[in-house]
Amino acid sequence: MSDSCPVAHEGNTRSTSESENPAIPSPTPTAHRPRTNRDWWPNQPELSVLHAHSSKSNPMGENFDYTAEFAKLDVEALKRDVIDLMTDSQDWWPADFGHYGGLFIRMSWHAAGTYRIADGRGGGGQGAQRFAPLNSWPDNASLDKARRLLWPVKQKYGKQISWSDLLVFAGNCALESMGFKTFGFGFGREDIWEPEEIYWGPEDTWLGDERYSGDRDLSGPLGAVQMGLIYVNPEGPNGQPDPLAAARDIRETFGRMAMNDIETAALIAGGHTFGKTHGAGDADLVGPEPEAAPIEQQGLGWKSAYGTGVGKDAITSGLEVVWTPTPTKWDNSFLEVLYGYEWELTKSPAGAWQWTAKDGAGAGTIPDPFDSSAGRAPTMLTTDLSLRIDPAYEKITRRWLDHPEEFAEEFAKAWYKLLHRDMGPVTRYLGPWVPEAQLWQDPVPAVDHQLIGDSEIAALKGKILDSGLSISQLVSTAWASAATFRGTDMRGGANGARIRLAPQKDWEINSPAELSKVLQTLEQIQQDFNSSQSGGVKVSLADLIVLAGAAGVEKAAKNAGHDITVPFTPGRTDASQEQTDVESFAVLEPRADGFRNYLRPGEKLPAEALLVERAYMLNLTAPEMTVLIGGLRALNANFGQTGHGVFTDRPESLTNDFFVNLLDMGTVWKGAASAENVYEGSDRVTGDAKWTATAVDLVFGSNSQLRALAEVYATDDAQQKFVQDFVSAWDKVMNLDRFDLD
């Protein structure tokens, strides 16, 4: 993404990040350990991700209700305590300028800023910054101190405030304590108790950048330029001090966090209105990160041997920059300094590339963090100059120079978005400071009518089953609507009926022509029903789509000899196209959906691995994934109505035939010569063709763990259990976005 650097210089420092990180050549080598199955057979599906964060690792217990505990919290008292903390400087880590505001802004930013829109992973929603690898990323150096400074507050309020809420709330309080009016704040994040296994990049060294190919093309879904960074290298790409090339990196990485140019410029300029970076001396004097630090340091890392190691001697990034003359006050001084001087390339005391006002201009106008009688020259990062040199950023920031009120408004909105981007719809937010829903929160209208009851539900099911739509059509449409959900950032799902809107209605996986016919039929049923009702009772299309799926499952179960009722709770509403950001929703389009036997053409990753990824996004366990595959194959719900994996002679009957026939030793499988990613099953004795399948189907007979699950549902006495488990898993998926039911 960047051009070659036009500036010649001596070399690159290893100490680089968007804000701060020490020089660490590579992660600590692993100690000898027994080999795992994953080591021996790395290509097997990684099912452990479906069982992470179990109740066994949670000390709060299965019945802990964070919402109920939070309701007991005095949020105003909490806010006062956090703000008081800002100016309570501790000798073991003294506050720059007597105020921890800059440190806490950085902590909150880096907690939330790992979010990436491509797969919804990262973000501050679970307090993951407390654990490896994030707690030891080079870019998060010294944030261990920020979390320790917060401990007395956490200790005081206990289970009424989660770490994940507190880590991001502290930054909000920091801004307000320095005179900034924030846009709002929502609590409601719940803690995890073990590290998440997330693909952060292919590198095995800190600050490695093997993630690029071609003309600096960043591999998806990654959102940072180097391993261990949140966004970009503040010295420039790979330490090359080129502001224009750095702008390209900035635009790419912030865009992958769902920020546009205005939001990006606002966050950088707003965040750098406060505090400083730290590079008082040689970065090689900084000790190991928290996960590699000696046990006696009790989880604190990056202990420095330079001088006192703290305060005026602190080293974090190797950069030594104070951006403004008022680093503990909100004003427009960052932009005034940025545009008020011409800049020349210099080096910090640690040898990192940074910029200083030319010809000694402004000398003494910038305060020293610990000596009020001393003054400094204005300094900036390479990435700061990007806001002035890149034409698009320059147009935005130069306007703000003359219109500071616009800058303040844009920073407030961008900061709010940064802290909350991974939390899903506003209905999940808690507390008194939640503003109205924003477009990026995928809003849906409030229910403004009486909901359907049992009698209306029964009548609508009858209309649906008499409409001429097949079980396959009913089930496929309901699944397509609900299975857009991502548990990583709580986006997607059936609420809103966005399957009828752009972009979802046009996705290949949804078979647009077929989908249109189904939706037209359901919309007619909806209109006829709503026009015939009195007393304000109505049904939304979102509810009707899910109800239609339930009716289809019930009919299929009846076809197999089972009389069941699929749970259904009305209350969904229909979003409008104006409430739907097409570009933002585009990232939800599945590259694969093994539940419908869909694989995007040209996809390089194994289909079975993508199935596990889809199951993870749907918060499914391995048994739930297994029973859903078997049931959806029996219901003939494949993309394009292919017969792959439909191992039954009675499709649209909810039977366990998929498992019975998959495990039948009378079938021999081989790769199909006529189609990629397709297998053909033939009779072991006669050689007659029997079935076709994909890797998603066959993995349930090939993988030992999945085969064990398949065997449970293939036994002679498993039919009832299969139906019950399928209905339970189906209902779970249909309600993944029903946060109003929690």
Swiss-Prot record:
Post-translational modification remark: Formation of the three residue Trp-Tyr-Met cross-link is important for the catalase, but not the peroxidase activity of the enzyme.
Entry's Gene Ontology cellular component terms: cytosol
Cofactor note: Binds 1 heme b (iron(II)-protoporphyrin IX) group per dimer.
Listed EC numbers: 1.11.1.21
Covalent cross-link Tryptophyl-tyrosyl-methioninium (Tyr-Met) (with W-109) as placed by the record, residue numbers: Y231-M257
Residue segments, region Disordered: 1-42
Catalyzed reactions: H2O2 + AH2 = A + 2 H2O; 2 H2O2 = O2 + 2 H2O
Residues noted as binding heme b in the record, renumbered to the chain: H272
Cross-link (Tryptophyl-tyrosyl-methioninium (Trp-Tyr) (with M-257)): W109-Y231
Any one Pfam family match given in the protein's UniProt record, by short name: peroxidase
Annotated site (Transition state stabilizer): R106
Entries under InterPro entries matching the protein: Catalase_peroxidase (IPR000763), Haem_peroxidase (IPR002016), Haem_peroxidase_sf (IPR010255), Peroxidases_AS (IPR019794), Peroxidases_heam-ligand_BS (IPR019793)
EC class (word): oxidoreductase
Active-site residues, as the UniProt record annotates them: H110
Essential cofactor(s): heme b
GO molecular function: catalase activity; heme binding; metal ion binding
Keywords, sorted A to Z: Heme, Hydrogen peroxide, Iron, Metal-binding, Oxidoreductase, Peroxidase
Gene3D superfamilies: 1.10.520.10, Peroxidase, domain 2 (1.10.420.10)
GO biological process: cellular response to hydrogen peroxide; hydrogen peroxide catabolic process
Family listed: Belongs to the peroxidase family. Peroxidase/catalase subfamily.
Function per UniProt: Bifunctional enzyme with both catalase and broad-spectrum peroxidase activity.
PANTHER family on file: CATALASE-PEROXIDASE (PTHR30555:SF0), HYDROPEROXIDASE I, BIFUNCTIONAL CATALASE-PEROXIDASE (PTHR30555)
Name recorded for this polypeptide: Catalase-peroxidase
Organism: Rhodococcus opacus (strain B4)
